[in-house]
Amino acid sequence: MKPIVYMLLFCAFTVVILGHPNNHGALIPHHDKLPNGESCTRPGYSCSESSQCCTPVDGETFTYGCGRAWMEGSKICYICNRESSMC
């Protein structure tokens, strides 16, 4: 019984330390302001349209938008590689 409890605790700590695997491009460099000077919505946060989302610094390699997240009911901002099939 003890090994099972230890294994569950290890898994729980691993999830807490490593965090959620879907970061929606938050680690990709992006601009924090819109061209009009207003703040933009960071990747992974809720939005209603693409114009609210932060744009990637490298616009040729990465694309951005506001779309439905898998297993979530709301729309969120995302940044992903243009050549990735996971976008």
From Swiss-Prot:
Signal peptide coordinates: 1-19
Keywords attached to this entry: Disulfide bond, Ion channel impairing toxin, Knottin, Neurotoxin, Secreted, Signal, Toxin
Gene Ontology CC: extracellular region
Expression across tissues: Expressed by the venom gland.
Any single Pfam family the record assigns to this protein: Cys_Knot_tox
Chief location: secreted
Any one GO molecular-function label of the UniProt entry: toxin activity
Function: Probable neurotoxin with ion channel impairing activity.
Stated name of the protein: Toxin ICK-41
The organism of origin for this protein: Trittame loki (Brush-footed trapdoor spider)
